[in-house]
């Protein structure tokens, strides 16, 4: 054994070829944490000291290659400021450079995922061979940063500026065919041929059949474009990238382009310094903190879901009650992920609607070449429409998705319970009605759980799994595991009106109503909140949700939280409802909707909307300060999020933030309501609440936040 470290071993194979093997002990994956980087340095020294080694094959002892840097170490490194980040990176560059500069050929045998720092490791090798099962890429932009271990410098020299920008800015892992086509890897082979293929390349390089020194030299020099070609390449790249990523919201792509441009005319070592300086600028942004936090929060949510796996019972057959758009969407989602599902309704027209919805969604998959026609047929065969309960004795879980009316739901749930086995779980897809309340209609409330899908089901990743007062842990566990099997991200919450997401969303709509009442133009509110980062403003959002749905939901919320969700005035949303303006459902709401050239509903300004709300505006019509609009909208939403934590509706800030991002489109680069409070500063946030407390209870800082401010605490760190 030439080197035996905690993360890397080096041992001789044959013919002067050694295996440089990454296998981080005590971990399921390889990653570049501090320990691995130190061991990397030691392993390089061991190779340098051994005169028998003529070439290296770089391998992994895990099912993945190297998944990247250790993101949990970023917070500590990034908190030190730009200079300290550069001072941290440059010694890492020296280690990677010393490996690249070894006077012998090196081939990476990429057996699985090689992302971020993992692929940057591959780039310091002279050749790269990829298994058919592997994926490679530099997705750091998703974290609000960009490649920091030399990836931007080496990839741009290897595959050209245009391709490199696309790889890094789009942040999409590349499959073997795409990586080979772009020239990022040199060969793709079957998994069982990987080591042989990599070893053969090393042999060819040692024998002189491959000019590995010339291939390496390309990465050590400036980009092979003259100044005019460089300017054209970067102008094209900037146009494409900045059209998709607003630098005010996502600064990393622009910083990446600036760094690439600064380093394009420089040799490797100077270009790496430019990369490090740009990386440091990105790393200290609040967006990087939020997006890295989001990645870590996603791991927290996945870990919480995994803990339910042991307590779940298998779901071999599911059923959905109600064959509307929602029921059809649920049936499609279950069937497309392999779970057979019975779809029941009270009439053939309703069943036809549900099957049409599933059929339309599957047809789109086929048209986009994401599914073969035969697979579509197999998926449709997993959905069995029925008018009776005859087959319900074989069902493991029933998802009720009938109209959002407590009396209707109670009747349907009680009837269903009589037609299923004693251990069958019944889940309600209610969006606001208390699970504990609905459970009173049942004989076996322990088998009853909330399973709240968001609309449209096939697109929205979140499922709220709601624990009622008497819901068993088995019911929770089974529902969580089914949601995961359906390709969704489940978050378990405790019962209350609106659960988590809608409980937080309705004060946001309430803040909108109050702003309009006070004289704000709803279009200004929409524009301000869109620029803030929401996918759409609140007026447009309520039009999309359905104004009737919003009004009915608001009634449930007002009953549950009268102190802050029951206004003593009639708002603009209710005015629209009374005027039978329901939003996109009937093409008139706050906006008017007409089909565009693509057949999608496009919004236009409708003067009638202003006439409808005019009688309910009591304030002087004026242009509000943008920051006041942001503060009033965000305080109402963030306060209710904090109250949900205070009331133990949701277990952690991580889950609360993820739910808001996945459920209502909270701007990801702001990290969620809890991260937003942290970044505002908890004491400063509480002071803002005090400033607007005269507007009502929704604006009063929850005691939890006052305590945190007094003790200098944050949600994160």
Curated annotation (Swiss-Prot):
Pathway: Lipid metabolism; fatty acid beta-oxidation. HAMAP family: FadB (MF_01621). GO terms for molecular function: 3-hydroxybutyryl-CoA epimerase activity; delta(3)-delta(2)-enoyl-CoA isomerase activity; enoyl-CoA hydratase activity; long-chain-3-hydroxyacyl-CoA dehydrogenase activity; NAD+ binding. It comes from Acinetobacter baumannii (strain SDF). Substrate binds at residues 298, 502. This is Fatty acid oxidation complex subunit alpha. Involved in the aerobic and anaerobic degradation of long-chain fatty acids via beta-oxidation cycle. Catalyzes the formation of 3-oxoacyl-CoA from enoyl-CoA via L-3-hydroxyacyl-CoA. It can also use D-3-hydroxyacyl-CoA and cis-3-enoyl-CoA as substrate. Its EC number is 4.2.1.17, 5.1.2.3, 5.3.3.8, 1.1.1.35. The active site is at 452 (for 3-hydroxyacyl-coa dehydrogenase activity). The record marks 120, 140 as: Important for catalytic activity. NCBIfam families: FadB, PRK11730.1.
